Amino acid sequence: MSWLRSSPLRQSFSKSGNNSNSNGGGSANDRSRSGAGGGGLSSVIRPFDATECDPKACYDSFCIHWQQAYEIIQRSESHDDVLGVVTHLDHMVTLLLVELHHCNKLSLPGQPTPPAPCLEHLLSENLLDKLYEWGIKTGRYANAVRLEQLKLYEQLVSHSRHQLLVHEPFLRPLLKLLASSQNEIYPPDVEKRLVILLNQLCVVLMQNVHLLDLFFFSTTQTQQSHHASNGGHTNFIIFSLLIPYVHREGSLGHQARDALLLCMALSQKNSNVGTYIATYSSICPVLVTGLGGLYSRLPNQIEIKTVDWYRITTDDVTELPELTLFMNSLEFCNAVVQVAHTMIRQQLLDFLYQGFLVPVLGPAILQTNVESQVSAMAYFDLIVRSITEPGLIQIVIRFLLDEEKFDGQRILDVLVERLNSNDSRLCMVTLSLFDSLLSLNCEDIMLELMLKYLLHCKHVPISHRYKINRVDPYTQAVEYFLNITPDIMKKVNSVLSINNGGLASNGASSAAAGQPAVVATAKTIGANWNHYGLNTTTGETLLANYQAYLLDARNRIVQCKHACDQWNNVYRYQKLSKANFTGAPNVAANGAGSSGQNSLVNPEDVRALKQLDSLQSIGDSSGYESLNVFSQTSNDLVAPGTMPQEPQLKQQQQRIDAWKVSSVREEPIGDLDLSEDLFAQGTVSLGPFLTAIWGKLQTFTSNCLYVNLHLTGLITHLTLFPLPLLHSILLRPDIPTTSDTPSFHQVLKILKQQIDAELPDTDESLEIVDMARSFLVDREFRLVNMRKNAIESAASGKLLNGGGSSMTSSLSQTTPMQLTPSSSYDPFKRQDGKRKSISNSFSNIFRRPGSVGKNPPSFPSRSSNSNGLNHSPNGRQQPQSYTPASMNVPSPVGQQQHQHQSVSSVMPPSGLLIGSSRRESREAETQFMSIDTSSLQAGGINAPSGHVSNGSNGNDLLHPHSLEHGLTSYSVGSERQLNLAIGAVLLDEWLRELSAVTQEQCIMMLSEQVQQQQQQPPARTAS
């Protein structure tokens, strides 16, 4: 956990005064007790029974101790004299705490208040003031005396709640002590006590806001009396004393940030505090300059030791102290933007943009060295996944789209260009970054990347444009994606179906029906999974589980639609006049700050189109219920095996006009300008982003496996948006495109032809594909069990620190041991009670175990959610779901479920987190441990790890290209065939996911139509 989650700050926001009393001082006080050191007031933290104390005897003893201490004060200072005063103060505070304990007891109404003679004597005789005046004259013992005074005030403030703060004999010397601490450098023990006392004061003021003005103005008077060099303006001394400690490491920095954040929250309740912080304090410049300084300390080049590394995880943050400090500072800025006064918030955002993003992060991203580019983009991706406040997200988007700050080029355009990089590391980091940006669900990002190139709809021939907003063609697209799977995969699926008792592995299509008889050599397909102790007749792996794809797709689509409903504009194709078309590409260019006047439709129309999530009513249903809904709805549209009749379609369009801007009847082809479209045939560009994506997809069969995972995951993420214009090029094979590059569906057909040509339907090909599938399933269970062991180790308190040695285990045991650094830091974890699903357990299939390097800048292989992170981890989360392309790792929720399963029955069937939000996606981040590659070669499967710790032999390292797939131990097939087999399995899974997404998008649109129709008033009948 980060400082924000491990501190008492969260409780202090909502903790009442009574709770504070019962707790006896709060967590900060507890920390102060444990760190008091020897001697002094630390001895007051000894157990005592207040019920056995005689109040009269206590008072007499209190007076005697003070008299003896005062006699020492009158003499010259010496070591023994100072020690004697401290000893007497120790006993006096003990007696005061006993008395305060009596006073704080609950009493019945009408009963007299318990007497407090010691406290009255303390206040009436101005003992604290005399003690302060003596302390400033103690010379070389001044710091020791100040330390004891800070301990004294800390104990009294924490145990007396707010009673003492209203008494001038207590408040005046306290303010003098604080005022004299300004612009001073103290030893660490004095600094610690000072920050703890300031934290205690902030907690008390937060719980008793009515005391703030008294404290604030009393501070002003004290400052003026001491001739402070603050120009004579009012001064909130608690806040000004905390600023120097905001970037400190360890508990001291945590305490200071807690207290500063409480002051920021107080600024919402008291205008004086807000005005002081925004006008007179230096907190915003200090935060931003400190953030930039901490960023400059990060490694300029990350040492990457595995081929599949693509993002910084929470374990990486923990292992690198410089990165931990940077993330603490960034998270604190995020928290300040969340709770602070509007003036403070806006000032901090301006400083962050002008003082960090533009001068620090921009040049870092624009470096020319590939290693530096990878590091800078990984840091930027971490920043995007970590921030949650809309204000911070807005300035990040502004940073990406700014053309003036970087010599006329935009950061977003530079990132798009890097998608074409031949360096797999840079490409994977870039794809991961774009996935994080898409997880923001930001209108401006979508507009700049794609929508502004699609709004005119010139990429669709005139004769097909009327189809864009129609729903019924989606039903045909569902089977289209299932039918274009490679022939070898159809054969394998048929074999698996027969070997598993006739149960089809995809559960959704009969496309594989009618395949020729299975040859004898292929009868072993599927049987080699039994060594995991799983029932092969029940679909033991999430590979090819169509029901899980449906569940995952529905949840992610609902989540994405909910975010997109907040957009300022509705991006649906409509016939517009040229006057309206002129400004269309500039719609929503200002993002969250844009208004409805730039929309394609009126704000009233936008609000009318905003509906509840269409699948709420079936949100708790299974994937089979989703199939039933789809089946029933599609039967209403068109009878099975028949084409829809035009009168029926027109009648349906009349009933559901509200779901789109314009209906088919209002778009006669004859009214369109043909000349402009004819000249645009074959020359229309879909934009550099989609062009780069299509170009990368065309090299699918030669790409690195992990590049393909991120590439297909990113494309799947695009299909989740409720944008028919985007669906027209992704999910609608019935709509041709006139772009200057091959369409998405043409590329898919080309890939199918390549795989069919190079991997024909032969016995050898079947065996190679069987090996590829077995490798992916082995990988799935190995990673699931590795994370399961990590959770069990953490729960039992046996989790080992560091990562300098490797733990070995045989893969046949399915529960390899591992190491992971123990850490409480988690800046991406978000709590969310949303429904979880099984889909994230898919993610294990194509993720890898990592290795923990000894050198801090080295980030070994760790998987995290490639879709977001978010929300999820993250963070985030995150947060994430399974995309066969994104094949994400299991979420903590799922990991906890695996923890309660036996090793022989570890299955990832249900309960795992899917991509419901950025925050949830950050939760899905998983950290994998260091393992010896030589120990994972059971069953012919090699661990894809490129790092061996000091305890292992360097000869165990595999060739990097071999690490990519882990199939080098197989003697069947060439390397090209093995790569094609992996690609074929991946393509088959991805097409299933696209089919599921298409089906759920259709259900979503149909449900929306039904809701729109139900909300329409009934038509009036003629009288």
UniProtKB/Swiss-Prot annotation:
Residues 1-39, 797-927 are annotated as: Disordered. Residues 1-13, 806-825, 868-888 have a biased composition (Polar residues). Pfam families: DUF5917 (PF19314), KELAA (PF19311), RAI16-like (PF10257). This is FHIP family protein AGAP011705. It comes from the Eukaryota. Belongs to the FHIP family. Residues 889-906 have a biased composition (Low complexity). It comes from Anopheles gambiae (African malaria mosquito).
